């Protein structure tokens, strides 16, 4: 028996797989989930979810949301998610550099918050790409 993981965005099911273990980017840190985990509802931060299928770890970029764990079913509801195979490394590097530059230029509170969110997303994308190397 294993965990069934569903990653859902407002407009589609992004990912549905059976895995042995997942590590979630919760708002309080990394959260590991194995079979028969106690029921749980947790907030998710921007970051990389890692799922272990047999002996392979598969990363998925999550952009904040919630996860519900119950009876070996993990339902993840996020504002957006990206599979690593859909991320272009060169574009991700450019986005990271642009995000860092925008962070330095931000003046208003709104600009600072938006640039911080964009920077966190760019870092998560690069972290996911680098985890495959």
From Swiss-Prot:
It is found in: Plastid, Chloroplast thylakoid membrane. It is a peripheral membrane protein. GO terms for molecular function: ATP binding; proton-transporting ATP synthase activity, rotational mechanism. InterPro entries: ATP_synth_F1_dsu/esu, ATP_synth_F1_dsu/esu_N, ATPsynth_dsu/esu_N. The keyword Cell cycle does not apply. Coiled coil: none annotated. Keywords: ATP synthesis, CF(1), Chloroplast, Hydrogen ion transport, Ion transport, Membrane, Plastid, Thylakoid, Transport. One of its GO terms (cellular component) is proton-transporting ATP synthase complex. Its main location: plastid. Gene3D superfamilies: F0F1 ATP synthase delta/epsilon subunit, N-terminal, Helix hairpin bin. Belongs to the ATPase epsilon chain family. Produces ATP from ADP in the presence of a proton gradient across the membrane. PANTHER family: ATP SYNTHASE DELTA/EPSILON CHAIN (PTHR13822), ATP SYNTHASE EPSILON CHAIN, CHLOROPLASTIC (PTHR13822:SF10). NCBIfam families: ATP_synt_epsi. F-type ATPases have 2 components, CF(1) - the catalytic core - and CF(0) - the membrane proton channel. CF(1) has five subunits: alpha(3), beta(3), gamma(1), delta(1), epsilon(1). CF(0) has three main subunits: a, b and c. This is ATP synthase epsilon chain, chloroplastic. It comes from Cyanidium caldarium. The lineage of its organism: Eukaryota, Rhodophyta, Bangiophyceae, Cyanidiales, Cyanidiaceae. The gene is atpE.
